Each structure stands twice: as structure tokens, then as C-alpha cells.
């Protein structure tokens, strides 16, 4: 119950710019005329609530950011809007407090925090411990550009241009950019659909598609970034090794030099990362400036006339014939193919997620990610196209590097464009021994530039910045994945340190993975490995955007509008296609890993709820199919037993729940009905609390069922509501399942009338009826009218029942005494299909005449064979109408004796009054009219004891008592007599007399 403290105020202070306690309580009293409404009121319980509402007679608050935020800002109390109970219920003053006379599910302090506490700190100064946040330029654009401008730009783009030619190189670049641009648009849409936290790509995919795909791609993406650290570090190490070799100072040998330099370099990068995001960001800005200077240096170098040394290496400045020759491809080596070049180049376009991966460190991710990412894609694309075109116009493919290879007078043979510029590289070209030229020399950009050390510095800046960005991305993404605890044994790496919650342990793990791949020491081997992982990530990002759009969920409202769901789908498909065109076996491995991780999360079912598009899609499918079912006419072949089970709280009836679930699981509808009895609907607010608890209990027990509760004045009216309102369209119950009322002889007669009345109501609503009785009882009357604290339901130990275990090689005995449409046969058939009941033998017992036993048995066997149920053992009971034993008859008479009117010698008026006052009692006339039927129940019990004492389950046709002609106590006596003294569970079934089995094919 929410409490609002009331402070005593003098009369002249009863002024309010918002509301007063007097108007709040009285509802009609206006404020005093002397009030100065320009001053804030003190009648707001000592709070600033008056700042959050307006007008008189209301505690409604105006819209505010705090009401929708999941957490309060640092230094501020949590603020919440008033609940519906606060606004709707009557407020009663008791002493100095106002009590809302309604159930409030929130803790009392939460309301106080929201409505009463002073909003101090709303304009509080920035906390000195607040983490560093970046804008779109420094945080996203520069970071993405640095990650895109990696080792491939300087060391492989000239070589790719020589292999593929300028035209196909542009096609490779534009194809890569098309994929990344579409992905960039998808990332922009997803990142602007709500507040983005840390976790980058993993956070965006997991919150869009759900934990299943999000978790798998998060793990793969973190791993791909860790391998990316190795790729860029190896590129840096190659450059340093070449410099050492040119100066004649190698460390060991070419391969081991790369390994040594790479490990030392990645260790330094680890130290920078551990210093914090602020230092890492400063290092990135420095690298960016170095790269820009190196670009300018390269472009100036292409304009400077070639020196003799550069000419010997194939550089002749801009010439049209060089440009024309380099337009077409000249494939060489094992990687000499379009997709071979594409697989090597594509990782250089994959840095578009570098900004999104530090989403938790951005000031406004929703603005920074779209703007910075798309600008980075644009500028880097221009740079790639420009470098490919310019270097392809200046440098020939083959050159010896020997300054003496000039053309000499004489008849010697000279081939190639270099001949026109006075150089003869024919010998090395024919012998494939040229060490220089566009296709042979990886450091061509350095050679072309005006000042080679600046290109080397650019290579250092590009490789180190990309490696640093990948290291940070890998750790940040993995940290968020660890915090969500979707996978076991990784929570250790999720711990954050310092004001920025730096993932130190994640850095160390990424460092270890990077070192392992640096040992490979071959850039062309590492690059294709991560291409598939990045493409897999892009495919899922695009699919996330498409899926969220196609579900038409009201929650999908990205502020970034320049995206297309069909472009996103195309991006997803083309990413998968490219994966297989690049390296089909690596694509299969990547998809296999994703599927394995996906199935693991599906199996574990983590308790997270992120409002994913998968959930929205599930709703759409369910809605579409449910509406579609309305157009389908009922047919016997499509009949399914859809059960409304009167469990009360399901945890009070585990045996009943388990039994019904056995034949409805994955087949039909099961609803656990619960009637809360309360006059005047006083317990309405409880429903939302207890419903979630009971649903979680069902889920924990792995029962596929719905929980439905209603509040009613009495049990019978509540069940009537359930029977009429439960279900949706064709998905409505057609069978009412109840437990046997074991205490009917001692219970209040009104509850007995309700119980039998419920059965009559079920038949009136055209329901079939099943009554389950177990020897140990089900506590029907208590369970149907009681409930437990919902918060304790999930924690309580799950009660085991006999229906959860194997039933062995016992029998399921079916007493098909009367034809109810076939429901008495269908339910045991469905049970027998389940593994727990599969070893049981089914026996069918029918009534018959002793002189026609064989004929009747053959007739029933023939009928059962037409139903294709697989029931072959049939027994005919010829003595079903024999008189029962005297002592059993006597026991029945003793059972009904307390419920008799004994009206045989009373006048008619007295008898009529007695029947009106005691409708459950049995008159002498009713006993006489139903004597044969009563004796039949006694005799049937004797037969059950003779034939089915050791059965796993007894199923028999439920007798029907005619409404108004059979008192409730007599009917209960029949049910009691039928099922008493039996050890196996007994299920009494009566269909609605409509066929549920057919032997026709249409």
C-alpha cells in the first residue's frame, strides 16, 4: 500500500500552483482566494512533485525522460510515474498519511522515490569519475577510417591492381563497398532504434534478433577482431622486416623476424589499450594525422618525374599507355583470380564496425554511428579508387630494379612498355625473376612517393591503428557477451576495471589469440580466414534490419530513415554468396560454428527478454495462423483434444498437469484454469502478479501450457467464464478436465452443488469432460480456491509425480461402455504414442450379452481396426448387468444415507419445500428411479477390481446424470462407487457425443 506523508500546514499556506491535500481528499474544494499561485506550494509532501504536474485535483505527472529510462542518472533518485492504482483508487487519510486503497505491486519505497523525494541533482555537475565519451568524428569516423585503412591499402592494393587490372580492381572495391554500405545503412537503422549501450555489433544484433543469433555472432565477431589484430600486426612486421633487410640487419630470418616483431608490437598495443580509452583515442588521432600526411606524400610523388632508380623499379610517372595496359588483368600465382583478389582485399573494407563496437563510449551513439560510419565508408572508398587508378597509371607490372637494364643499341629483343621509356626488363620478365614492378614489389607505394619514410610511417600508422581498433573491439564486444552470460565459463572475462569499465581480461584474451595467429607470419593466409567471419557478421546485421522491418513491430522505429529492408535482405544474401565464392570450406566452418552456438543457446534458453524481432515475428506468425484457422472448417480428421484443466494454482496439481500434458504436449492446446474467489473483485490487481509466477512454474517443469485466471463471486461462475472466454478463434478448449472431489461427503453441500454444476455446465457448453482420480487424492476443493505467493513458485522444489516416470509393461485398460464419439479411445491412443507409455499393453473392455460374445467381440475388433488405433486385445463383459454382491450394495446405501430426504411418509408440500431447501439431497422417488443405474456402478467397480487391479491406468466411460433428475450427492456417490478401492489412476471420460474418430479418408 503506497503511503504519502501529509505535513500539517497553517491555513494561510493552503495555496498551490498544482494541487493541495484538501482538494486531493475532498475533490471539490477550490483553493483559497488569497492564494498566490505564483509561488510553489508546500503542500506537495515536502517534495517537488508540483514541478511534475499541473492543475488541481491530480497527482498525474507530465511526460518526462526519467519515466522511460531503465536507470536513474548518476546522483539522482529514480523517478517513476504514479501507478494506475494511485490514480484510480480511493485515497483514505489515516493520521498523517494517505493510503491508496488498492493493491500496488511495487515496493513502497519505489513510489516514495518517484513521487516524494526531492529531485536534487537534476542539474548536478559532472561527476569527476564519469567516463570519457566521444563524438561522431573522433569516436566513429576517424576510428572507422583508420580501421578500414589497414595493411591492405599500402601493401596489397598496388599488387591487387597489377593482378586484376584497374577495371576489375575498381569492381572489387565497389563490390566490397556495396556490401559494407548496405551494412552501414542497416547498422545505422538498428543503432537509432533505441538507446545503444556498450557491446557494439553484438549488442545491436542480440537486441534485434535475440540472444540465439546475437550470442553466436558476438562470439565469432570478437574472435574475428582478435585475428584481425594479428593480420594488421603481421602487415606492420612485414614492413619493418623489409626495412631491416634493405639495411642489411635482419634479426634471424624473414619468417621469424615477422614473428618476433609482431609479438613485440602487439604487446605494445596491449599496453596502450590497458592505459584506457582516453590514451587509445589520442593514439588513434596521431595515427590519423600520419596517414593523411603519407597520402599527400604519395600523391606528390606520382607527379614528380621519375629518377633513374625509380625508373629501374618500374615507375615512369603518369602515362596513358601504362594506364591502358594496367586496365586489364594479368593473373599470376595461386591467388591469381578475381575472388582470390577479392578475398585478400575484402578485410580492408571491414573496419566499418569499429565505431559501433565502442558504442558504450560514445556521447550519442544514435547520431554518431550512422553519421560517422557512412562518412568513413565514403572517404575511404574515394581513397581506394584514387590510389588504384593513380598507381596503375604510373608503374609497369615488371621491373628488375637494376639501373643497368637500359636499352642498348643493337638487335637485342625488348618486350614490354618499359622499352618505350628506355628500359629493357625482358630477361627478368621472361624468367619471372623480376623483383620490382607493380606485381612483384609490395612496397611500390613507398617507392613512388616523394619521401619514402613518410609512406613507411603511414604503413605503421594504418597497421597499428587498425590493430589497436581490432584489439579494443574484440575486448569490448566479448565483455558485453560475457556480462549477458549466454555461454558457460566466459563470465570471468566480463569484469570491468576503472571508470570506463575497461575489459582488462578481455584484452589479455584477445592478445593471446592474436599472438597465436601472428605465429603464422603470412598475411595472405590470415586475411581470407577473417573474411568469412566478417561476412557472416555482415549477413546477420543486414538480416537483423530486414527481419525487424518485415515484422512491422510497433517497437521498430529507427530515427535513421535512409535504409531499405529489401536492400538489407540483398546485403545479407550477397554476403553469404560471397562467403562461399571466397573459400567454400571456410564458409561452411563459419556457418557450422554459428549453428552450433545457436543451437546451444536455444537449448539453454537463457532468461533474457530484449524485445527482439524474432519475438515480434513469432507474434506475427501466431496471429496470422490463428486468424487463418478461422477460415478452416472443423473436420473429424483434424480434431485435437484441447483441454481446459481446472488446476487452480498449477503447482497444487502437479499430477493433473503432468497427465494432461502427456497427451497434449506438441499436439494440442492445454490451459490451466484458476478461479480466484473474491466478492466485489477485490483481488483484481493480484492477477498480473500471480500469472507470471505460475507461467514460470509451468516453463520450469517444461509443460507447454497456458495459465489463465479469473476472479469471480464463486467457483462455478468463474469456471463458466473460463469455459466461455478461454482460447482464441479455433484454438479453444473442447474438453474440461477436473480432479475428483475426494472430500465430497464432508464438504459443504454448496461446494458439492458447484462441482456437479460445473460438469453440467461443461455439457451445456458442448464440452467433453474428463475426471481424474488418484488414490492419494488431488485436493480439488482446496486447490481450486487457494493460491500461493507468486515469487515463491519458481524457487520451490518441483514435485515429482508418477506420470513423469516410465510406466513399464503394465496395461492401459479402457472400459468403452457407452459410445461417446470416440474420445474414450482417442486419449489412451495419444498416451500410448508417448515414450513413457509406449511399453504398456492396451486392453479394451466392452459390455455384451453372454450368448453373443464372439459376434460382439469381432464387431468391436473390426471397428477398432477401421479406426487404425492399433488396439487388438478386446474383452467382452457379459456379466455387467448382474447384481452386485450384497455387502457392496449395502456399502453404497450407507454412503448415500446421510444425503437422503427420507420423504416417503411426508405430504407433498413438505417434500417440495425440503427439495427447495436441500437440492443436493436424494428423495425416495429418485432412489427408486435410479436404482438400476446405481447397482450398475457398484457392479462395475467389482469388475474393475477383478480385471484392472494392477493396471497402469484405468479409463472408463463417465456416466451422465440427467440435469434436474439426479441430485448432486447421488451422482457423486456413483463416481465414488465406480472408482473406490482402485490403486491405479482412474480417468472417467465422456465426449460431447460428436465423432472424434473416423475411418473415412475425407
Curated annotation (Swiss-Prot):
Modified residues (Phosphothreonine): 44, 48, 53, 58
Catalytic activity entry: chloride(out) + Na(+)(out) = chloride(in) + Na(+)(in)
Residue numbers spanned by region Scissor helix: 613-628
Effect in UniProt of substituting residue 404 to Q: Abolished N-glycosylation, leading to reduced localization to the cell membrane
Phosphoserine: modified positions: 41, 47, 71, 89, 124
Side of membrane Cytoplasmic, spans: 1-135, 188-218, 359-369, 476-505, 543-565, 598-1002
Activity control mechanisms: Phosphorylation by OXSR1/OSR1 and STK39/SPAK in kidney distal convoluted tubules downstream of WNK4 promotes its activity. Also activated by OXSR1/OSR1 and STK39/SPAK downstream of WNK3. Activated by isotonic conditions. Inhibited by thiazide-type diuretics including polythiazide, metolazone, bendroflumethiazide, trichloromethiazide, hydrochlorothiazide and chlorthalidone. Thiazide drugs specifically inhibit SLC12A3/NCC transporter activity by competing with chloride for binding.
Name of protein: Solute carrier family 12 member 3
Organism field: Rattus norvegicus (Rat)
Gene: Slc12a3
Amino acid at each position: 500500500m503506497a503511503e504519502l506523508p501529509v505535513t500539517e500546514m497553517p491555513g494561510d499556506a493552503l495555496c498551490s500552483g498544482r494541487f493541495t491535500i484538501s482538494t486531493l481528499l475532498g475533490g471539490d474544494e477550490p483553493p483559497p482566494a488569497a492564494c498566490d499561485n505564483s509561488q510553489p506550494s508546500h503542500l506537495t509532501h515536502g517534495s517537488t512533485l508540483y514541478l511534475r504536474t499541473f492543475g488541481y485535483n491530480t497527482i498525474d505527472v507530465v511526460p518526462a525522460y526519467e519515466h522511460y529510462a531503465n536507470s536513474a542518472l548518476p546522483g539522482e533518485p529514480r523517478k517513476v510515474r504514479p501507478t494506475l492504482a494511485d490514480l484510480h483508487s480511493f485515497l483514505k487519510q489515516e493520521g498523517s498519511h494517505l493510503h491508496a486503497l488498492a493493491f500496488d505491486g511495487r515496493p513502497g519505497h519505489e513510489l516514495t522515490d518517484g513521487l516524494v523525494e526531492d529531485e536534487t541533482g537534476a542539474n548536478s555537475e559532472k561527476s569527476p569519475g564519469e567516463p570519457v565519451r566521444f563524438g561522431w568524428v573522433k569516436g566513429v569516423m576517424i576510428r572507422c577510417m583508420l580501421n578500414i585503412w589497414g595493411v591492405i591499402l599500402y601493401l596489397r592494393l598496388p599488387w591487387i591492381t597489377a593482378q586484376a587490372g584497374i577495371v576489375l580492381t575498381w569492381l572489387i572495391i565497389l563490390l566490397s563497398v556495396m556490401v559494407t554500405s548496405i551494412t552501414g545503412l542497416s547498422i545505422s537503422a538498428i543503432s537509432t532504434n533505441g538507446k545503444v549501450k556498450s557491446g557494439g555489433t553484438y549488442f545491436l544484433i542480440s537486441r534485434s534478433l535475440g540472444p540465439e543469433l546475437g550470442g553466436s555472432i558476438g562470439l565469432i565477431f570478437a574472435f574475428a577482431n582478435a585475428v584481425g589484430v594479428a593480420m594488421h600486426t603481421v602487415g606492420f612486421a612485414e614492413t619493418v622486416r623489409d626495412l631491416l633487410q634493405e639495411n642489411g640487419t635482419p634479426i634471424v630470418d624473414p619468417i621469424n623476424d615477422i614473428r618476433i616483431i609482431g609479438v613485440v608490437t602487439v604487446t605494445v598495443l596491449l599496453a596502450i589499450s590497458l592505459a584506457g580509452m582516453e590514451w587509445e583515442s589520442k593514439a588513434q588521432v596521431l595515427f590519423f594525422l600520419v596517414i593523411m600526411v603519407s597520402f599527400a606524400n604519395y600523391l606528390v610523388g606520382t607527379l614528380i618525374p621519375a629518377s633513374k632508380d625509380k625508373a629501374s623499379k618500374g615507375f615512369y610517372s603518369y602515362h596513358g599507355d601504362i594506364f591502358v595496359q594496367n586496365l586489364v588483368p594479368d593473373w599470376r600465382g595461386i591467388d591469381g583470380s578475381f575472388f582470390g583478389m577479392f578475398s585478400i582485399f575484402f578485410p580492408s573494407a571491414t573496419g566499418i564496425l569499429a565505431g559501433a563496437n565502442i558504442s558504450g563510449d560514445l556521447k550519442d551513439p544514435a547520431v554518431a554511428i550512422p553519421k560517422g560510419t557512412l562518412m568513413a565508408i565514403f572517404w575511404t572508398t574515394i581513397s581506394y579508387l584514387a590510389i588504384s587508378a593513380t598507381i596503375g597509371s604510373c608503374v609497369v607490372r615488371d621491373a628488375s630494379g637494376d639501373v643497368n637494364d637500359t636499352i642498348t643499341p643493337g638487335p637485342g629483343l625488348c618486350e614490354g612498355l618499359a622499352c618505350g621509356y628506355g628500359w629493357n626488363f625482358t630477361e627478368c620478365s621472361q624468367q619471372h625473376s623480376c623483383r620490382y614492378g607493380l606485381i612483384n614489389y609490395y612496397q611500390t607505394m613507398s617507392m613512388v612517393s616523394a619521401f619514402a619514410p613518410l609512406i613507411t610511417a603511414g604503413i605503421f600508422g594504418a597497421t597499428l591503428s587498425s590493430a589497436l581498433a581490432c584489439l579494443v573491439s574484440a575486448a569490448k564486444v566479448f565483455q558485453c557477451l560475457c556480462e549477458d552470460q549466454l555461454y558457460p565459463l566466459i563470465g570471468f572475462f566480463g569484469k570491468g576495471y576503472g571508470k570506463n569499465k575497461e575489459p582488462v581480461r578481455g584484452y589479455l584474451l584477445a592478445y593471446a589469440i592474436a599472438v597465436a595467429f601472428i605465429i603464422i607470419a603470412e598475411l595472405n593466409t590470415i586475411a581470407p580466414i577473417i573474411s568469412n567471419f566478417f561476412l557472416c557478421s555482415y549477413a546477420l546485421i543486414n538480416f537483423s534490419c530486414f527481419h525487424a522491418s518485415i515484422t512491422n513491430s510497433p517497437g521498430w522505429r529507427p530515427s535513421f530513415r535512409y535504409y531499405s529492408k529489401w536492400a538489407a535482405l540483398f546485403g545479407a544474401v550477397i554476403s553469404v554468396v560471397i562467403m562461399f565464392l571466397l573459400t567454400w570450406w571456410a564458409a561452411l566452418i563459419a556457418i557450422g560454428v554459428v549453428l552450433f552456438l545457436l543451437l546451444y543457446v536455444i537449448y539453454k534458453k537463457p532468461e533474457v527478454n530484449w524485445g527482439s524481432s524474432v519475438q515480434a515475428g513469432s507474434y506475427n506468425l501466431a496471429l496470422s495462423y490463428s486468424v487463418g484457422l478461422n477460415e478452416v472448417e472443423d473436420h473429424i480428421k483434424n480434431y485435437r483434444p484441447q483441454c481446459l484443466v481446472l488446476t487452480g494454482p498449477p503447482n497444487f496439481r502437479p499430477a493433473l498437469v503432468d497427465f494432461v500434458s502427456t497427451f497434449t504436449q506438441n499436439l494440442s492446446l492445454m490451459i490451466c484454469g484458476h478461479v480466484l474467489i473474491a466478492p466485489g473483485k477485490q483481488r483484481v490487481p493480484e492477477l498480473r502478479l500471480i500469472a507470471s509466477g505460475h507461467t514460470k512454474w509451468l516453463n520450469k517443469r517444461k509443460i507447454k501450457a497456458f495459465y489463465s485466471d479469473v476472479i469471480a463471486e464463486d467457483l462455478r461462475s468463474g469456471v463458466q467464464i473460463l469455459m466461455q472466454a478461454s482460447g482464441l478463434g479455433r484454438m479453444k478448449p473442447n474438453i474440461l478436465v477436473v480432479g475428483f472431489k475426494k472430500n465430497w461427503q464432508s464438504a459443504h453441500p454448496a461446494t458439492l452443488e458447484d462441482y456437479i454444476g460445473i460438469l453440467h455446465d461443461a455439457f451445456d457448453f458442448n464440452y467433453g469432460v474428463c475426471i481424474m482420480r488418484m488414490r492419494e487424492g488431488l485436493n480439488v476443493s482446496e486447490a481450486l480456491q487457494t493460491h500461493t505467493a507468486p515469487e515463491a513458485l519458481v524457487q520451490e522444489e518441483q514435485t515429482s509425480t508418477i506420470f513423469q516416470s516410465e510406466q513399464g509393461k503394465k496395461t492401459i485398460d479402457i472400459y468403452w461402455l457407452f459410445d461417446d464419439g470416440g474420445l474414450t479411445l482417442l486419449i489412451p491412443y495419444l498416451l500410448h504414442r508417448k515414450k513413457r507409455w509406449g511399453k504398456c499393453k492396451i486392453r479394451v473392455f466392452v459390455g455384451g450379452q453372454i450368448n453373443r460374445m464372439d459376434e460382439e467381440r469381432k464387431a468391436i475388433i473390426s471397428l477398432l481396426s477401421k479406426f487404425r488405433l492399433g488396439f487388438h486385445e478386446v474383452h467382452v463383459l457379459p456379466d455387467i448387468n448382474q447384481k452386485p454382491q450384497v455387502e457392496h450394495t449395502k456399502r453404497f446405501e450407507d454412503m448415500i444415507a446421510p444425503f437422503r430426504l427420507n420423504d416417503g411418509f411426508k405430504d407433498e408440500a413438505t417434500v417440495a419445500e425440503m427439495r427447495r431447501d436441500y437440492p443436493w439431497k436424494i428423495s425416495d422417488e429418485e432412489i427408486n428411479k435410479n436404482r438400476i443405474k446405481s447397482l450398475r456402478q457398484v457392479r462395475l467397480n467389482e469388475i474393475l477390481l477383478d480385471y484392472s487391479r494392477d493396471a497402469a491406468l484405468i479409463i472408463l466411460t463417465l456416466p451422465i446424470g440427467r440435469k434436474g433428475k439426479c441430485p448432486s450427492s447421488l451422482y457423486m456417490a456413483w463416481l465414488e462407487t465406480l472408482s473406490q478401492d482402485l490403486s491405479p489412476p482412474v480417468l472417467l471420460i465422456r465426449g460431447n457425443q460428436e465423432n472424434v474418430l473416423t475411418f473415412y479418408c475425407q
